[in-house]
């Protein structure tokens, strides 16, 4: 199974890379913004999102990076986990990070009479 050639006669290989000069891959509804003399082309093709800078009108080829096998932590959580000594506490074990709060006095509820 071959892919149709792009506008410059090159063949698009969607499994490994794609060419933005091809009408099949070119973003239709978005205009290119000019940033410092380079055309910034937003690309959203088969799950790949990015801003591609091209100094000329030559075809742009994008090689998508493979996704890591492990799920990344949320920003900030990696620092929190990195500062912990050792592994997480076993189930049922409590490691308080702050001293316990003092007991709270029993205050009457608003609207109730004693």
UniProtKB/Swiss-Prot annotation:
Residues 6-22, 33-53 are annotated as: Hydrophobic. Residues 28-68 are annotated as: Interaction with host HPX. One of its GO terms (biological process) is symbiont-mediated suppression of host innate immune response. Palmitoylated in the N-terminus. The keyword GTP-binding does not apply. Residues 95-104 are annotated as: Interaction with host SRC, HCK, FYN, PIK3R3 and GRB2. Residues 91-114 are annotated as: Disordered. A motif (PTAP/PSAP motif) lies at residues 96-99. Residues 72-114 are annotated as: Homodimerization, and interaction with host AMBP/bikunin. Its main location: host cell. GO terms for cellular component: host cell endoplasmic reticulum membrane; host cell plasma membrane; host cytoskeleton; membrane; virion component. It is found in: Host endoplasmic reticulum membrane; Host cytoplasm, Host cytoskeleton; Virion; Host cell membrane. Keywords: Host cell membrane, Host cytoplasm, Host cytoskeleton, Host endoplasmic reticulum, Host membrane, Host-virus interaction, Inhibition of host innate immune response by virus, Lipoprotein, Membrane, Phosphoprotein, Viral immunoevasion, Virion. It is a lipid-anchor. Small multifunctional phosphoprotein involved in virion morphogenesis, egress and counteracting host innate immunity. Plays critical roles in the final steps of viral release by interacting with host TSG101, a member of the vacuolar protein-sorting pathway and using other cellular host proteins involved in vesicle formation pathway. Also acts as a viroporin and forms ion conductive pores allowing viral particle release. Impairs the generation of type I interferon by down-regulating host TLR3 and TLR7 as well as their downstream signaling pathways. Belongs to the hepevirus ORF3 protein family. The PSAP motif is necessary for the release of membrane-wrapped virions from infected cells. The viral particles present in feces and bile are non-enveloped, while those in circulating blood and culture supernatants are covered with a cellular membrane (quasi-enveloped). Forms homooligomers. Interacts with host SRC, HCK, FYN, PIK3R3 and GRB2 (via SH3 domain); binding does not activate the kinases. Interacts with host AMBP/bikunin and AMBP/alpha-1-microglobulin peptides. Interacts with host HPX/hemopexin. Interacts (when phosphorylated) with capsid protein ORF2. Interacts with host TSG101; this interaction plays a role in viral release from the host cell. Interacts with host SIRPA; this interaction down-regulates the phosphorylation of host IRF3. This is Protein ORF3.
């Amino acid at each position: 199974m071959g892919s149709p050639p792009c506008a410059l006669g090159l063949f698009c290989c969607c499994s490994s890379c794609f060419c933005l000069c091809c009408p099949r891959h070119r973003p239709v509804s978005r205009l290119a913004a000019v940033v410092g003399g380079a055309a910034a082309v937003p690309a959203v093709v088969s799950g790949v999102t990015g801003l591609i800078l091209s100094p000329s009108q030559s075809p742009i080829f994008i090689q998508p990076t493979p996704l890591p096998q492990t799920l990344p932590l949320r920003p900030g959580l990696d620092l929190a986990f990195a500062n912990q000594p050792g592994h997480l506490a076993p189930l049922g074990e409590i490691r308080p990070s702050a001293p316990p709060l003092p007991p709270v006095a029993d205050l009457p509820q608003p609207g109730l009479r004693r």
